[in-house]
Amino acid sequence: NLSNPLLSLIKTPAFQGGPVLGNSSQNDQDLVSLYLNLPEVRQLLPSANRYIKILWGKEDENGLTGLYAIKTNRQDAPPLSGGVVVDASQSFDATNNPAVSMQMNSQGAKVWEVLTERAYRQQSNIAIVLDDVVYSAPGVSRGAISGGRSEITGDFDLNEAIDLANVLRAGKLPASADIIQSEVVGPSLGQE
């Protein structure tokens, strides 16, 4: 597509309204990111979305990677770092699907309650990011989550749930996971 070369590099996700804006092959990621970060493209964003960071997810079984637009702040600092996660483990939800249980310290629990309330009200998502890769971007299904204990459910298999628990536990390591509010809608995050 010569009139819009970006559209030839991005495939529309099968599920509209989710956190993934589009999918692209890993070979095209740098070019897509370059296009999306051009000043003339960034200028087109409404002022409320001025601080947007373009991030990619993990490659799927078809060799495609999800594109996310993550809302940040002027300092590009995440509202929560993985250091607030005191425990995370793979579990199973009420319907016996793989899930991740997570517990935060008291400081993290307070911020988490505010983030989850906002995500619930705005029907947006919360991205879990490690080394600028989005590992999960669940939505909030039942309102603010207080107390810092949460269960992350979604369309992932057992190995993906184990990986996500490991990413959340990585907060104790130098390369900690960041938890960032995103402005899109998708899979679900509920109170355990």
Where are these regions (language model features)?
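A generic structural motif
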Residues: 100, 148-156
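A short acidic/small-residue loop/turn micro-motif
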Residues: 141-145
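A mature extracytoplasmic/lumenal domain signature
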Residues: 104-106, 156, 181
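Residue-level signal for pocket-adjacent positions within structured domains
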Residues: 135, 147, 184
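Generic alpha-helical secondary structure
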Residues: 109-112, 157, 161
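Short glycine-/polar-rich loops that comprise or flank the Walker A/P-loop
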Residues: 124, 147-148, 173
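Non-transmembrane, solvent-exposed regions of membrane trafficking/translocation machinery
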Residues: 1-140
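Juxtamembrane "pre-transmembrane" interface segments
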Residues: 159-192
